[in-house]
């Protein structure tokens, strides 16, 4: 039987060679894109209009990946990263690009994919929702790593595409008061007798104070609890422990829940307060979240007694403001704990024109008690999108649909469904929720035309 020789695509010679490439654009993950011998080459850290020296790390039939060795001709958008941990930490991936350049890239990428699938054009674009480029995160989870040999506990973030923990002393995108707590917390945790059994540390900045949630795998002794309590008092922070069952316990005091406000830029009577447990999802950029909610209210323009459905409602981030403005709101969420918290928030704000349901929004919705004719629809799904939920549009027939997206790909796919059902894209806007990263969020307004 004849045998044919086939060269191995990833030979050491092919991968070790260095070459110069010209970068022409960024991909959706923020990596530079170049062309070489008919292949697309992805180069993390490279920017458009740059000439770079690279070394291949992976070769496939139609594409390759390369490591940036040197920037030979820099882009005018290239800047020096502000964070000393940038090149090892996996949190940010665009600090080497100017903030204006990041936003220009994100808006162009959003418009490009939405033009292909939803007929978006330049005139459809609304002004970007932008805020502070640094210290904007009000929440972050730090990983811990205990070294059995040195008996030292490291506190930091995971490296890119790795489970390795990169110890950090600061975070340039985390709220400054929280960033300033990283080193003191690392010292404190290393003083605990139970440091080998500690899990992650979550830091939260809320309108009613600063919070820390420490994951533990076994109960702490009195000495460790006393150290945590003293630290909490010294740094004016609420500390709570989360055990293996997901239960939370306050340290040195009763458990206090973090709270944030919405619509508080108007009259005090218009504001709504949302409390959440450390396990609940909240938008990490408080400044942009307020702007996002305000824009959704403006686009939906809720009127008195209108029936508005809020799918993937979480703990009421959009539902409560809609009800505050007079609409009859139905919120549906797939996570039971979030539904419970949404009901708590509605009661705390004395909002009775608001009903929450727990349900699987990817399942058959035809028999759900809330299914039926509505005036308007708001969607805020996870990255997977809302494709299954949109199959029931004929039964709901909303005049307006506001879609809040954290994934342009699923937004584009779902937009095609809306267009098929007789809706037209009226407005599209970038939401820069995560500056210094490649992540793109957006809001789209669709109106029924037939």
Curated annotation (Swiss-Prot):
GO BP terms: rRNA base methylation
Top-level enzyme category: transferase
Record-listed [4Fe-4S] cluster binding positions: 83, 89, 92, 171
Keyword set includes Signal: no
Pfam families assigned: TRAM, tRNA_U5-meth_tr
Molecular function terms, GO-annotated: 4 iron, 4 sulfur cluster binding; iron ion binding; RNA binding; rRNA (uridine-C5-)-methyltransferase activity
Active site per the UniProt annotation: 406 (nucleophile)
Keywords on record: 4Fe-4S, Iron, Iron-sulfur, Metal-binding, Methyltransferase, rRNA processing, S-adenosyl-L-methionine, Transferase
Coiled coil: none
Catalytic reactions on record: uridine(1939) in 23S rRNA + S-adenosyl-L-methionine = 5-methyluridine(1939) in 23S rRNA + S-adenosyl-L-homocysteine + H(+)
EC number: 2.1.1.190
Keyword ATP-binding: no
Binding-site list for S-adenosyl-L-methionine: 283, 312, 317, 333, 360, 380
All copies of domain TRAM, residue ranges: 12-70
Source organism, top-level taxon: Bacteria
Known role: Catalyzes the formation of 5-methyl-uridine at position 1939 (m5U1939) in 23S rRNA.
Family recorded in the similarity comment: Belongs to the class I-like SAM-binding methyltransferase superfamily. RNA M5U methyltransferase family. RlmD subfamily.
Stated name of the protein: 23S rRNA (uracil(1939)-C(5))-methyltransferase RlmD
Organism: Shewanella baltica (strain OS155 / ATCC BAA-1091)
């Amino acid at each position: 039987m004849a045998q044919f020789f086939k060269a191995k695509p990833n030979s050491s010679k092919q991968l070790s060679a260095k070459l110069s490439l010209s970068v022409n654009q960024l991909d959706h993950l923020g990596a530079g894109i170049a062309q070489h011998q008919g292949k697309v080459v992805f180069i993390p850290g490279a920017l458009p209009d740059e000439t770079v020296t690279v070394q291949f790390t992976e070769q496939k039939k139609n594409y390759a990946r390369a490591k940036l060795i040197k920037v030979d001709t820099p882009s005018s958008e290239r800047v020096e990263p502000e964070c000393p941990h940038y090149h090892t930490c996996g949190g940010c991936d665009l600090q080497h690009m100017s903030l204006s350049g990041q936003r220009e890239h994100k808006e162009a990428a959003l418009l490009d994919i939405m033009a292909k699938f939803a007929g978006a054009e330049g005139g459809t674009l609304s002004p970007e929702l932008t805020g502070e480029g640094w210290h904007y995160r009000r929440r972050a989870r730090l990983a811990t790593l205990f070294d059995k040999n040195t008996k030292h506990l490291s506190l930091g973030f995971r490296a890119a595409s790795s489970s390795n923990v990169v110890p950090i002393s600061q975070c340039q995108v985390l709220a400054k008061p929280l960033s300033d707590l990283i080193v003191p917390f690392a010292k404190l945790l290393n003083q605990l007798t139970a440091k080998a059994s500690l899990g992650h540390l979550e830091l939260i900045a809320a309108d009613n104070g600063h919070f820390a949630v420490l994951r533990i795998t076994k109960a702490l002794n009195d000495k460790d609890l006393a150290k945590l309590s003293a630290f909490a008092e010294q740094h004016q922070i609420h500390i709570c422990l989360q055990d293996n069952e997901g239960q939370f316990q306050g340290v040195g005091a009763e458990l206090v829940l973090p709270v944030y406000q919405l619509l508080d830029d108007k009259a005090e009577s218009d504001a709504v307060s949302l409390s959440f447990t450390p396990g609940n999802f909240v938008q990490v950029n408080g400044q942009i979240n307020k702007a996002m909610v305000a824009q959704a209210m403006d686009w939906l323009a809720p009127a008195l007694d209108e029936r508005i459905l809020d799918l993937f409602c979480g703990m009421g981030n959009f539902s409560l403001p809609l009800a505050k403005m007079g609409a009859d709101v139905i919120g549906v969420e797939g996570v039971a704990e979030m539904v419970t918290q949404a009901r708590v928030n509605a009661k705390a704000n004395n909002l009775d024109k608001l009903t929450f349901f727990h349900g699987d929004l990817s399942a058959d919705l035809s028999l759900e008690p809330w299914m039926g004719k509505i005036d308007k629809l708001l969607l805020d799904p996870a990255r997977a999108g809302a494709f299954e939920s949109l199959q029931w549009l004929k039964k709901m027939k909303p005049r307006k649909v506001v879609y809040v997206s954290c994934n342009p790909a699923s937004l584009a796919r779902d937009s095609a469904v809306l267009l098929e059902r007789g809706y037209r894209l009226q407005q599209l806007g970038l939401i820069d929720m995560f500056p210094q990263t490649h992540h793109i969020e957006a809001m789209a307004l669709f109106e029924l035309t037939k």
